[in-house]
């Protein structure tokens, strides 16, 4: 089941991430059309009207003209298309076209922090947005928010170490949300159940 768009928006707002938050979108997210300020959003790789597929996060830092894409699974472009028929290049291009130079830098997550048995992709996106909000020039690593979780190459996800690491990540993520989001605390029982480990049987 995972998390709904409404739940994710409420979590983001309860974390105090108001300035620059564009909202929750499906695969038709238009990109960052105002590149004069930092902005961020959570985007589904599918059509939300038809149920949605997988949550990822996008952010744009206007100071460094950097476009960040955070996928909790760290899938390659090929895997994103194979699994979800999702491509982000249109979003990247529409953002670049708003700049006079037509030039922006892409930084994309390449490591997995979430287990494939989990439905917590939206919650991991909230963690990334908090990281970007407070550390917009280095949200992917090297700050106390995102460094709460550890990454592993996606090819190692189903290894014993990969399963152990990503399961630990989810436990730390839940503890962080309980500590920092009043909305998550209020709805913790249901949200933890809906995003739990072993929600999907992708490994034994």
UniProtKB/Swiss-Prot annotation:
Positions of the record's site feature: Cleavage: 51-52
Catalytic activity: Cleaves proteins of the adenovirus and its host cell at two consensus sites: -Yaa-Xaa-Gly-Gly-|-Xaa- and -Yaa-Xaa-Gly-Xaa-|-Gly- (in which Yaa is Met, Ile or Leu, and Xaa is any amino acid)
EC number: 3.4.22.39
Recorded superkingdom: Viruses
Keyword list, A-Z: Autocatalytic cleavage, Disulfide bond, DNA-binding, Host nucleus, Hydrolase, Late protein, Protease, Thiol protease, Virion
Enzyme class: hydrolase
Positions of the catalytic residues: 54, 71, 121
BP term (GO), one: proteolysis
One GO molecular-function entry: DNA binding
Induction: Expressed in the late phase of the viral replicative cycle.
Task of the protein: Cleaves viral precursor proteins (pTP, pIIIa, pVI, pVII, pVIII, and pX) inside newly assembled particles giving rise to mature virions. Protease complexed to its cofactor slides along the viral DNA to specifically locate and cleave the viral precursors. Mature virions have a weakened organization compared to the unmature virions, thereby facilitating subsequent uncoating. Without maturation, the particle lacks infectivity and is unable to uncoat. Late in adenovirus infection, in the cytoplasm, may participate in the cytoskeleton destruction. Cleaves host cell cytoskeletal keratins K7 and K18.
Protein name: Protease
Species per Swiss-Prot/TrEMBL record: Frog adenovirus 1 (strain ATCC VR-896)
Lineage: Viruses, Varidnaviria, Bamfordvirae, Preplasmiviricota, Tectiliviricetes
Gene: L3
